[in-house]
Curated annotation (Swiss-Prot):
PROSITE patterns: ACT (PS51671). One of its GO terms (molecular function) is acetolactate synthase regulator activity. Residues 10-84 form the ACT domain. Gene3D superfamilies: 3.30.70.260, ACT-like. Chain A, domain 2. Keywords: Amino-acid biosynthesis, Branched-chain amino acid biosynthesis, Transferase. It comes from Methanothermobacter thermautotrophicus (strain ATCC 29096 / DSM 1053 / JCM 10044 / NBRC 100330 / Delta H). It is an enzyme of class 2 (transferase). It comes from the Archaea. InterPro entries: Acetalactate_synth_ssu, Acetolactate_synth/TF_NikR_C, Acetolactate_synth_ssu_C, ACT-like_dom_sf, ACT_dom, AHAS_ACT, AHAS_small-like_ACT. One of its GO terms (cellular component) is cytosol. Belongs to the acetolactate synthase small subunit family. Dimer of large and small chains. This is Probable acetolactate synthase small subunit. Pathway: Amino-acid biosynthesis; L-isoleucine biosynthesis; L-isoleucine from 2-oxobutanoate: step 1/4; Amino-acid biosynthesis; L-valine biosynthesis; L-valine from pyruvate: step 1/4.
Amino acid sequence: MIEMEPDTHIISALVEHKPGVLQRVAGLFTRRGFNIENITVGESETPGIARMTIIARGDDRVLEQITKQLNKLIDVIKVRDLEPAATVKRELCMVKVHAPSESERSEIIQYTNIFRGRIVDVSPDALTVEVTGDSEKIDAFLELLRNFGIKELARTGPTAMSRGSRTM
């Protein structure tokens, strides 16, 4: 779980979508001693441009240095420190759950429906479930599934945008 502690920052960056950019961005954080808790990268609304969402910890002074240094990288187009209260964050989780009996399957399906998830794969002794939402929702869902036995788990980590009509 990525908890938003006071020294945790959500940094959104638009970058050129080409090889080596992620490595240069991560290297900048490493050199400054600014720990990356999570990073997600994907295409944006503009062809050839990717959006990075970086969850990182550090004080405001270090964040200001990082933001300035990111803006100096040739492949970085724009950087913004997102205010947690004015940000929409979501992540995706896929979890394979041990479910050999009909009663266990039924209970897992009920939990999945309550959390508005989807069953994406079924095998004789397991269900694979997909759920999206904020980190707290996913943590709560996983806590319920732990009683059945989690066989495999994959989480994307949060991706984020500013609320309202404001854009990068």
